[in-house]
A protein has these predicted regions:
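N-terminal alpha-helical "arm" segments
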Residues: 1-25
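Short alpha-helix boundary/capping and kink motifs at helix termini
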Residues: 16-176
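Charged/polar, low-hydrophobicity segments characteristic of intrinsically disordered regions
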Residues: 42-44, 48, 219-229
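Active-site neighborhood of thiol-dependent amide/isopeptide-bond enzymes
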Residues: 179-180
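Short active-site loop/helix that positions an aromatic residue
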Residues: 183-199
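Charge-dense polyanion-binding interfaces
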Residues: 199-226
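C-terminal interaction module
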Residues: 227-306
Length: 306
């Protein structure tokens, strides 16, 4: 007898904008408030979260959306229906500046894109070569340096118009060589050159990726942003709770390396969505808006490659 009455009371309170279902969901599924686990990066360029790609739509993405479109749900008359909106922030979220014939020293490179070793397992290129290729660094001399630099797979040194190039992710701060081979010989040459205090000049194309600060500011102005597990139980539970509250929300999967999470956008101009956001924040659900702000601060304070 009491359960139906409690249910009716909950529905009554939801009708007046109290997020009862959402509160119950957060109590029953604490996994929704798990912190955003960053991938183990080491010295791998492929483990850097590709925030510059967040606005792009991949060929295999679902739901199929045109550039700048975001899928959402909200009340529509007596129904709770899906809708699609165009948010220009996602057409300009990431930026890439390309510099041809860019120069640096081998010591400026802090990570690589490809190696036979697991690049995510090492804190530095020195640690990788010490662990897996000690023979390559046994001869700390100009001869040992020249031998490693002569390796044909270091394409930046031995190819005309090589595919290898430099990449700098402004929110990460490190410079990477996006290589197709020669990782251990490159790291060994870098190791030896540092101990000989000998410069090794490099030249190639630099691609500098950054997050558009205005796009982030616009999203944060219009929405409270959170990240939840991209799992059926969590996503369906949140959807049902928002439907019970009749509050709108938008969602979008996060970039590569964070593909186990999805972003939730709660409109700041809708009182019910604002109440839902306050409850998510109170429960400790990951604040994606704050995280993006931190990335921009890191991006602004990181020295760009010269």
């Amino acid at each position: 007898m009491w359960q139906p009455i409690d249910t009716l009371l909950d529905r009554f309170r939801e009708d007046f904008g109290e997020p009862r279902s959402l509160r119950r969901l957060l109590a029953e599924q604490p996994c929704i408030a798990e912190p955003l686990a960053m991938p183990r990066q080491g010295v791998s360029a492929n483990a850097v979260v590709c925030w510059h790609e967040w606005g792009a739509i991949g060929a295999l993405s679902w739901p199929r959306l045109r550039p700048g479109e975001v899928r959402g749900w909200g009340p529509s008359g007596n129904r709770y229906a899906s809708f699609t909106v165009h948010r220009p922030e996602f057409t300009q979220f990431g930026r890439c500046k390309e510099v041809k014939h860019w120069h640096c020293d081998i010591q400026d490179v802090q990570g690589l894109a490809a190696a036979k070793s697991d690049l995510t397992a090492f804190a530095s290129l020195d640690a990788m070569v010490e662990t897996h290729s000690p023979a390559m660094i046994a001869d700390i001399s100009e001869s040992g340096l020249a031998k490693n630099l002569a390796h044909d797979e270091i394409r930046l040194l031995h190819r005309v118009n090589p595919s290898d190039h430099f990449a700098h992710y402004a929110w990460d701060g490190r410079l990477f060589l996006i290589n197709d081979g020669g990782a251990h010989h490159f790291a060994a040459a870098r190791y030896i050159a540092a101990r000989l205090v000998k410069p090794v000049p490099l030249a190639g194309t630099l691609r500098r990726y950054s997050i558009d600060a205005q796009a982030v500011a616009s999203l944060k102005r219009d929405f409270d942003l959170f990240a939840i597990p991209d799992q059926a139980e969590a996503c369906n539970g949140l959807h049902d709770a928002m439907q019970a509250l009749r509050a709108p929300y938008l969602w979008r999967r996060l970039p590569r390396a964070l593909d186990g999470r999805r972003a939730i956008f709660l409109p700041r101009n809708t009182p019910r969505a604002v109440r839902a956001a306050a409850l998510l924040r109170e429960a400790g659900v990951f604040d994606l808006g704050e995280h993006l702000g931190d990335l921009l601060h890191r991006q602004a304070s990181a020295a760009p490659p010269l």
